[in-house]
Amino acid sequence: RVLDLSRLAAGNMISHMLADHGADVIKVERPEKGDDLRTWKVNNISHWWHVYSRNKRSLSLNIKTKKGTEILKKLISTADVFIENFVPGTLEKWGYTKKVFDSLNPNLIIVRISGWGQTGLYKNFPGYGSLVEGMSGFASMTGEENQGPLLPPTALADMISGLSGVCLLYTSPSPRDLP
């Protein structure tokens, strides 16, 4: 079972690939707003959402309330994989430390995605694919010779992050298998 609390493309890419390969994915969304990916629309249709949410079960849950916290903890205790892409430190601020995760489910594999990593100079800044594509130099390698940098027409950095995440999950040993 996969518990996905991520928003937008990178985390959804991971859980979408796992769901396509048969995993039971529970997508946890904010009440009333849902996943921000729902708002990426063309002609009032969110094609992104339809692609990335397929084969998943969706749950609206306010994890900042007592009832929401109780439900989330029950879900964590039955999950194999937990995916999140909050700004580093957010889960800890809400009381979800490594110690808490371990007490709920010592075999849980946690996938944490952030634009700038969990440590380092930019860790507290929100990260978006277009920023990463620009700062990495990728955008300057595309386009025409006499043109400025050109961003890709898709969420390329997020998709690559998601594919990297799912590859790591497929190749990582399960905590159950470690000594």
Spans of model-derived segments:
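N-terminal helix-loop segment corresponding to the beta1-alpha1 unit
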Residues: 1-168, 172
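A short, hydrophobic C-terminal helix/tail in secreted or cell-surface proteins
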Residues: 173-179
